[in-house]
Amino acid sequence: MLKIGSHVSMSGKKMLLAASEEAVSYGATTFMIYTGAPQNTRRKPIEELNIEAGRKHMELNGIEEIIVHAPYIINLGNTTKPETFQLGVDFLRMEIERTSALGVAKQIVLHPGAHVGAGADAGIQQIIKGLNEVLTPEQTVNIALETMAGKGTECGRSFEEIAKIIDGVKYNEKLSVCFDTCHTHDAGYDLVNDFDGVLNEFDKIVGINRLQVLHINDSKNVRGAGKDRHENIGFGHIGYKALHHIVHHPQLTHVPKILETPYVGEDKKDKKPPYKLEIEMLKNGTFDEGILEKIKAQ
């Protein structure tokens, strides 16, 4: 079974149940959530996440595994503000606890961090320090380090940087990787003409067994732009053919594929989620040039 889904919202009183219902309405077989707002520290208590009802709904609809994304405010790479670094450590610990309580997620996707001007080496050492403070041999969920585009002072823009972080962490069996197609393309990897070569390079440097999550996004920018701007499937510089190849790649069948493509529409208040039709299009193997109009008409 193809494990494909998108980012969905866990909100209101229904929480996990609402997220599962949204995912099922898109024809998804997995999904990704934040356990609260990605840009702040406000979090509902675990008891209010409606876990039991959410899990029951998932089970009825054949969804076995989901992904959690850590909030953006975590920056383990910050060497200049100890309070920012400490917030990241404390908050990541809490996210591990919340994700464990869900019982259906094995991976927490984390942007490794930004060095905010101290240089990549200093940032990477700080990220290693943070992960060494957070990870324990007992934890049941992994931290999936996301491949980054290289925007600003982001660390993790190359497979070598990801490998350097992993190598420095004591309990690194608790680390995996989330491979983001837009980010790796924007960082300079040639997914369009040589994805197999890129995957082999990843295997040599990091190890393909660590690749546990895929973010499937097209890119608004040319390869190597270092920008990180997602585009709808088939309308960017990666294109439908390459993304379809990645989604159905025989070495990645077990890996959950998560779409984070932009909502569609000119009216900011009435943008439509593209996921139902994009998932359908990635399943059926044919690019639909009129898909954006169909999404708007939903």
Swiss-Prot record:
User: What cofactor is needed?
Assistant: Zn(2+)
User: Which UniProt keywords are present, listed alphabetically?
Assistant: DNA damage, DNA repair, Endonuclease, Hydrolase, Metal-binding, Nuclease, Zinc
GO biological process, any: base-excision repair
Q: How is the cofactor bound?
A: Binds 3 Zn(2+) ions.
The record's listing under InterPro entries reads:
AP_endonuc_2, AP_endonuc_F2_Zn_BS, Xyl_isomerase-like_sf, Xyl_isomerase-like_TIM-brl
Looking up CDD domains in the UniProt record yields: AP2Ec
Q: Where does Zn(2+) 1 bind?
A: H69, H111, E146
Residues bound to Zn(2+) 2 are E146, D180, H215, E260
Looking up PANTHER family in the UniProt record yields: APURINIC-APYRIMIDINIC ENDONUCLEASE (PTHR21445:SF0), ENDONUCLEASE IV ENDODEOXYRIBONUCLEASE IV (PTHR21445)
UniProt function note: Endonuclease IV plays a role in DNA repair. It cleaves phosphodiester bonds at apurinic or apyrimidinic (AP) sites, generating a 3'-hydroxyl group and a 5'-terminal sugar phosphate.
Q: What is this protein called?
A: Probable endonuclease 4
What species is given as this protein's source?
Answer: Bacillus mycoides (strain KBAB4)
